[in-house]
Amino acid sequence: MQKILQTDDITDNQVLRKRKRKRTETANSENANSALEKAQRDPYSGNAFLPGESSSDEETPLMELSKEELCNKIESLKEKLRSIRKENSRLRQSLVMLQVLPQAVTQFEELVGMAETLLKSGGAVSTPASTLWRATNNSSPDSFASLCSNSNSTSSSPSSVKAEEEQHPGEKQFTIERWQIARCNKSKPQKFINDLMQVLYTNEYMATHSLTGAKSSTSRDKVVKPAMNQNEVQEIIGVTKQVFPSADDVSIRRMIGQKLNNCTKKPNASKAPNSQDGILK
């Protein structure tokens, strides 16, 4: 009787093991089929990008793995995590480059415009005074050095001085370059004119000149200031109306005068570190 009971227990244990093994195999098979179907539906999602990914890792439950196998699996997951972080860092750098690229293109266009301006002014016989005033406040110091060297080389002899005096009435047409407009604040007309005149002239020039040359009734200065070149004033008005079509000539001239008055009230502003007025003296 005891042998029969022992035989029944052994048989029951074998049946239980077979059932457990069958359930495990069925579950693993279902998981493998599910993963295969998911990969077929969306081959580019999830872990499809991870290198060395194999479905064999999921075939064995973690509970049945040895300590060494678990350690190897953890190391493998850490390596994959490091790879993902490196890829994320590379993608962030690419995104930053794409964000900075438009600004770099704009700055490159400005440099091209400055180079074209220097090439045009380099072929002139003499450098007009108004051009020197504008060059002292440009962003590139090389432009001022180039203009000064050109002026010194052409005005070293009396004949060149006479040629400059003869050429002054027929001075080259005043033009505002695109890179100069790009540097200006375009939120309001007054801010645009302030920035544009700051690019074109130095503070000392604006402090010693007026819009029309007539003495203002509200001005405290006893000395009448010389008028700005009216061709330059019209050019500034034209450019401002291109940026702000609703602005009219009267309001633009008033804004130009306001900028000149502000520079008059701040005579020491021309002694800023970025000013090169001492060179002109």
UniProtKB/Swiss-Prot annotation:
Q: Where in the cell is it found?
A: Nucleus
Query: Gene3D superfamilies per the record?
Result: BEN domain
Compositionally biased intervals (Low complexity): 143-160
> Annotated region Disordered: where?
15-62, 143-172
Q: What is its main location?
A: nucleus
Where in the numbering of this chain does the BEN domain appear? 171-271
GO MF assignments: chromatin binding; DNA binding; transcription corepressor activity
Q: Which PANTHER family does the record cross-reference, listed alphabetically? A: BEN DOMAIN-CONTAINING PROTEIN 6
Quaternary structure note:
Interacts (via BEN domain) with RBPJ.
State the name under which the record lists this protein. BEN domain-containing protein 6
Which organism encodes this protein? Mus musculus
